[in-house]
Amino acid sequence: MPAGSMSTTGYPGVCSTTSYRTHCYIPVTSSVTLSSSDLSPTFGHCLPSSYQGNLWLLDYCQESYGEAPTCKSPSCEPKTCSTTGCDPSNSSVPCNSPSAGQVFSVCETTNVSPSPSCSPSTQTNGYVCNCHIPTRNASKACQTLRNGSNCFGQLNCLSKSFQTLNHCRLSTLGYKSYQNPCFIPSYVSPLCYISNSCQPQSYLVRNYHYSSYRPTSCRPLSYLSRSFRSLSYIPSTFPPLRYLCSGSRPLKCY
């Protein structure tokens, strides 16, 4: 078998160690922006209404067909059976490539062997696959993956063609609707910013860099008299800054 490749029992060469996942881990520390009518309606990101750890969770965004890498074969993560016991989900799992236009959030964990066994001298490897075939102008809902107290979100806001992102999906996960917010990294300034222009910035998505957007010229604001077309609210649980803007009320940072 070529170096760097894996296969499951009965499915040789299907799996590759190269990651094609669309998970994106966005570090957030101390600064974000609010959306306003000043921002171009041809770009935007969906910000959540909740914050946990140091990650934002992004929800229900459109992506262009050419932005995400084509998943010729699903990525696979090895799972090793315990030497003291064997979980059926840890047995060898076939990694079937989805058909064109189909989105696989998580591959089905179908067991290859009917009754896998583990012993101290042998181990049974299994694979969990996550593959995604991008489609033109496809809208996808972000899922929340929880691992203990850690929360991770999938980034599907990968719009190289600047698709208009008008809303986030109202879901039971606590997301709220925003219109074209723009993310500002914490190294810009610990002040409030509104920007009229953004330029591409690469965020590391495992082994790939997807284009995202950040402000290229921002101006600090302590008061904003223009009327906002939509309410943008960053919850007070976000440390250490609090943001609130509604209509023509003052925009303040605390």
UniProtKB/Swiss-Prot annotation:
Specific expression in the middle/upper hair cuticle. The keyword Nucleotide-binding does not apply. Sequence repeats lie at residues 193-202, 203-212, 213-222, 223-232, 233-242, 243-252. One of its GO terms (molecular function) is structural molecule activity. One of its GO terms (cellular component) is keratin filament. The keyword Glycoprotein does not apply. Residues 193-252 are annotated as: 6 X 10 AA repeats of Y-[ILR]-[SVPC]-[NRTS]-[SNTG]-X-[QHRP]-[PSY]-[QSL]-[SRK]. In the hair cortex, hair keratin intermediate filaments are embedded in an interfilamentous matrix, consisting of hair keratin-associated proteins (KRTAP), which are essential for the formation of a rigid and resistant hair shaft through their extensive disulfide bond cross-linking with abundant cysteine residues of hair keratins. The matrix proteins include the high-sulfur and high-glycine-tyrosine keratins. Has a low cysteine content when compared to the majority of known KAP family members. Possesses several C-terminal tyrosine-containing tandem decameric repeat structures. PANTHER family: KERATIN ASSOCIATED PROTEIN 3-3-RELATED, KERATIN-ASSOCIATED PROTEIN 24-1. Interacts with hair keratins. This is Keratin-associated protein 24-1. It comes from Homo sapiens. The gene is KRTAP24-1.
